[in-house]
């Protein structure tokens, strides 16, 4: 089975239609501190960190920035590579553009739809002898993705690094959190998607190899 991992779903997925999206100006009505430039920088940095962690085969540090479901999906695919003795290398990473297209609300969540354009070198080798299994060590891939960032509806942007006082959704205990926290009472890990934007899905829109 093909492992898409950090590169998202198979290429050729359909973009979220513009007709479904509200403009970012509407988001500022309920979240006046939302900063589009800061969000673009955050997403750009997260993309690079995500590729590096994927190559290192350790994504634990990404847990606060993913929803539980997306983290589990990524972890399952990474474990598949480990079990077969393979490493997927993602090198020469560059983020060429981050476009915040708009947002929509569904099921009590807000979804921020983001289009990323990136350049990478993507190849997979056997751990035992470094033999190339797939991809190319030299040819560059120019990728277009759609990222879906989500958070609970009604959440507001907090000052960078600020601690938020929240209640554990598992047992109701009070917690202080800026990225992630483990509840000392019930053991649940509270991540940013419950209080701030977290990555919940990736679509691969297009790919060109040069």
Model-assigned labels for residue ranges:
Residues 125, 169-171:
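A short, polar/proline- and glycine-enriched secondary-structure boundary/capping micro-motif
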Residues 48, 60-162, 177, 191-210:
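Structured, amphipathic secondary-structure segments that form assembly/contact surfaces
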Residues 9-93, 170, 184-185, 189, ...:
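Core segments of small alpha/beta cavity-forming domains
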Residues 1-3:
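Alpha-helical transmembrane anchor segments and their immediate juxtamembrane flanks
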């Amino acid at each position: 089975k093909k492992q898409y991992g950090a590169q998202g779903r198979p290429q050729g997925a359909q973009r979220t239609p513009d007709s479904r999206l509200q403009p970012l100006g509407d988001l500022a009505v309920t979240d006046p501190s939302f900063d589009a430039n800061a969000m673009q920088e955050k997403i750009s940095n997260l993309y690079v960190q995500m590729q590096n962690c994927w190559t290192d085969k350790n994504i634990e540090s990404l847990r606060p920035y993913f929803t539980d479901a997306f983290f589990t999906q990524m972890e399952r695919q990474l474990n598949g590579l480990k079990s077969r003795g393979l490493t997927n290398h993602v090198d020469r990473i560059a983020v060429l553009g981050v476009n915040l297209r708009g947002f929509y609300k569904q099921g009590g969540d807000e979804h921020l739809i983001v289009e990323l354009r990136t350049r990478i070198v993507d190849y997979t080798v056997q751990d035992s002898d470094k033999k190339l299994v797939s991809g190319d060590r030299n040819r560059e891939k120019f990728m277009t993705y759609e990222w879906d960032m989500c958070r609970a509806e009604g959440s507001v942007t907090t000052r960078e690094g600020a601690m938020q006082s929240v209640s554990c959704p598992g047992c109701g205990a009070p917690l202080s959190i800026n990225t992630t926290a483990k509840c000392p009472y019930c053991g649940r890990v509270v991540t940013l998607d419950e209080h701030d934007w977290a990555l919940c899905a990736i679509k691969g829109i297009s790919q060109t190899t040069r």
